[in-house]
Curated annotation (Swiss-Prot):
Protein's GO biological process: cell wall organization; peptidoglycan biosynthetic process; regulation of cell shape
Protein's UniProt keywords contain Cell wall biogenesis/degradation: yes
Pfam family of the protein (one): Asp_Glu_race
InterPro entries named among the record's database cross-references: Asp/Glu/hydantoin_racemase, Asp/Glu_race, Asp/Glu_racemase_AS_1, Asp/Glu_racemase_AS_2, Glu_race
Enzyme class at the top of the EC tree: isomerase
Pathway assigned to this chain's UniProt record: Cell wall biogenesis; peptidoglycan biosynthesis
Function: Provides the (R)-glutamate required for cell wall biosynthesis.
Native source species: Synechocystis sp. (strain ATCC 27184 / PCC 6803 / Kazusa)
Alphabetic keyword roster: Cell shape, Cell wall biogenesis/degradation, Isomerase, Peptidoglycan synthesis
Active-site residues annotated for this sequence: 76, 185
Family: Belongs to the aspartate/glutamate racemases family.
Record-given protein name: Glutamate racemase
Length: 279
């Protein structure tokens, strides 16, 4: 059995969105080793029910616990909104979500806060609740953006249609005169060049990825689990097509990762089928 400090940090998302968190881990915690899982066979998570999301998260965490990770970062806002509090009580390892770190960062930037997210995250009101717990007088506008994750996973970042979709989602927030925009989905950082074509320069962008990694660093230090030796290569795993994930992730990682397909433990007698993503 390896020393706890040498164990990997588990990171999971529905797809490539969690790579934004992974890059922050490389930057802020370069000596840590990572196990990354993308649940690509079942994305997008944003249209799933809370019950299904909780089942998916339990399956992922059960597998990661068997892999002896020392911590898990839920690099998925939908999972963080709908499952974090429950699974923190069920699993004997530190599990961090992205919403509270994102909310804390948002209120440091402004008081008129727009949040773009998946429909499930928006419906949960998780960001609104988290922001108001910190700053009750902050104004929060939430916008569900169901098309963003499929467009990113289909590598349509430079498609003119994506720009038009983004304009439609962002215009109500601009009409509300927001001063801060929170990426309420880890995928959305990949759309930053698109957003910059639409948003005035005074609107501050908040990406929770960097803030959840800062929280992870602090947690590791408190628990005495920081690794001080050389890291080992990141292990990339998916539930869907490894080649598709590897090709898509190259543009954000700067290298083409070796990706393996794994099978999660099914904790229900009926495992929901993946949603079909249509163009």
């Amino acid at each position: 059995m390896r020393e706890p400090q040498r164990s990997r940090i588990g990171v999971f998302d529905s797809g490539v969105g969690g790579l934004t968190v992974l890059r922050e881990l490389y930057r802020q915690l370069p000596k840590e080793s990572i196990l990354y899982f993308g649940d690509t066979a079942r994305l997008p998570y944003g249209k799933r029910s809370p019950q299904v999301i909780l089942q998916y998260v339990r399956e992922i965490l059960t597998w990661m616990a068997a892999e002896e990770v020392k911590m898990v970062i839920m690099a998925c806002n939908t999972s963080s909104a709908l499952a974090l509090e429950t699974v923190q009580q069920e699993f004997n390892m530190p599990i961090l979500g992205v919403i509270l770190p994102g909310a804390r960062a948002a209120v440091r930037q402004g008081r008129r806060i727009g949040v773009i997210s998946t429909p499930a995250t928006a419906a949960s009101n998780a960001y609104r609740h988290a922001i108001h717990e910190i700053t009750p007088d902050a104004l929060v506008w939430q916008m569900a953006c169901p098309e963003f994750v499929p467009l990113i996973e289909q590598n349509r970042l430079h498609d003119p249609y994506t720009l038009e979709v983004a304009k439609g989602y962002l215009q109500p927030l601009l009409d509300a005169d927001i001063d801060t925009l929170v990426f309420g989905c880890t995928h959305y950082r990949h759309l930053t060049p698109v957003f910059q074509q639409i948003l005035p320069s005074h609107i501050r962008l908040v990406d929770p990825a960097s803030h959840v990694v800062k929280a992870a660093r602090q947690e590791l230090e408190v628990m005495g689990l920081r690794n001080s030796e050389m890291s080992i290569a990141t292990r990339f795993t998916v539930s869907g097509c490894p080649q598709q994930f590897a090709e898509l992730s190259h543009q954000w990682l700067g290298f083409t990762p070796m990706v393996e397909k794994i099978s999660l433990p099914c904790l229900s007698s009926i495992c929901p089928q993946p949603l079909e993503i249509r163009e």
